Structure formats: C-alpha cells, structure tokens
Amino acid sequence: MTKEELQERQRWPLHQKVDHTLGVIDQFISRMNGNVYLAYSGGKDSTVLMHLCEILKPDILCTFVNTGCEYPSIVKFVRKMKDEGHNIRIIRPNMRPKDVWEKYGFPLVSKKVSHQINLCRCDLQAGRPLPWYVDDPKSFYKIADKWRYLFHTAYNTNDHCCHVLKKEPQRRLAKKLGLAPIIGVMASESNMREKDYIRQGQCNSFDEECPLKSKSLPLSIWTDDDVWQFVKERNIELADIYSKGIRCTGCVACGYGCQFADDTRLALLYKLYPKLYAHIMNYENNGVTYRQALREMLKVEGMYLPDENPQLSLFDLFDQSEL
C-alpha cells in the first residue's frame, strides 16, 4: 500500500468507514474462531470500538489495565461501563509506575526517540560507536541534535514503561485465555503507526504459526474527527475528562509530546489533580526527579512546567469558562 492509498481511505465518509470496520472485525472474529478480546483503555477511541465490536460479539471481553497512572475519571468511567453490563475485566501490571521509572528511566520526547536514546546510551556505555542511522538525515531513526544531551544525563530515558505497564499485562492475560487482541489505534496518530499500516496494507494481521500473535486494528483508517462524529451521531457516553479539555487519555504524566506548545497534558493534570501531579513529579531515576528531567526537556523548546512558568497563570493556559 502507498501513502496516497491510505489517504484515499482516510477520506472515505464515516458510514463507509463504519461498514469497513465492521467487516474487519467480523473477519477477525471468524478467523480466530471467536477467540478475541478488546484492549480497552477507557478513552474515546476504544469506547467507540467497544460499541462496534459488541454489534458483532455482544459478550466480547474488554480488558482494561489500571496502570496506576490513569486519570481517576477514566478509572471511574470504566467501572461504570462494567457495572452497566459491558464485559470488562480490570487488571493490573506487576510493577508500579514509580518502580518502572526508577528501574528503566523516564518517557521523554517520544516513544521512538526515547527508544533510540536508550539504545545509544547502551552503545556508548559499552564503548561501541553510535549506529549509522542516528546521524543519517534520511533515516526514520535519526535523532535530532537538540535531544542528544539525553545520551549523557544522569537519568535514563526509555520507552519500556508502556511495555511493562500496559502491553505485558494484556499479553499475559491473553495467553492464559487463548485470545488475540483487537486494538483501537489509528494510522493518523503518529508517523510510526502510519508507516506500520502502509507496510501491512490492511487492518488485520494473522500469524498462522502462533495465532495469538494475530491482531486487529479496525480503526486504522479513521481520524479523530471520525471518532467525534461517531460519538455525536450515536450519542456515545464518554468519560467526563473530555469535557474538561483533555484530548488524549493515556498515562497522565507521560512525557511524550509535552514539549509541543499545544500540548496541555501537564497543565491539565496540574489543574485537575494537583496532588497527583506533585506526587508524580517526585518519581526518580538514578536520584534525579521526573520534575528535573521534564524541566530540562521543556527548556530545549523554551517552555516551562505549568507550576514553574513565571509568566503564565492557569487563566492564561485555559479559557476562563473552563475554570
């Protein structure tokens, strides 16, 4: 598949995407003999996908990982959905976020950059030269000069937290139950997901040798606007955190993307859950706090943590109607 072909599918009207998505889910359920589950986050995308999956398999198992780093509003909403009859199982990881960051390092800049930073740090510490692609301007994995200070910091930068806190608990349960995942991600969310979809060429991937490695990404060709349109047209209930300005309901203090001027995740956390914000800012790696690491990352872009900005108040960060 080409990028142009993906973009053509992304321009389909919503009703066509819904039909396509139901076909994708139906094919996956059939090929897997019904042995499937929905990786449920409690966010808008996976809530829309839950409603679509339940059209074809009303009793589909939806697994929610309470990582300990979720918005309280999301956890409350998931429990409400469970109480209302959705087949939701709430599970937990084996480690707390605090312990994961202390052992592996902080999630900074982006998943791709933090992964490459960690690999490069390992090479440098072992006396090996940096991989060629780090400096190749044509390489997808080139690391921008402004982030190379992370090669030498006292604290580690790593993308391992997502694996430990989210993916591993899901996989462990799926292996125990013999189920393959349906996941609510979209190609439009990142360059990496776009490249993955173009390479795959379709929403479903099947592994004949190890069926549990098969997976379905039925919302791949959807956009954020499609999700909101579907929510409005079908009157889908969402967690109330969305009415308070949040756009992404992942881990509350994840450092991925916080360096962008339009990212208000940390400001919202500080505004809505100040005690949780203060608690997470004190997480450590190698004796350095998350606050210190974030402060250094934001400084690269001339930005500040929401409680350290000398020029802004909360009234500057949000519409006064939201406060």
Predicted regions and their residues:
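ATP-dependent adenylation/nucleotidyltransferase module used to activate substrates
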Residues: M1-D226, E233
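ATP/NTP-dependent adenylation/nucleotidyl-transfer catalytic domains that generate, transfer
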Residues: T2, C210-L212, D224-L323
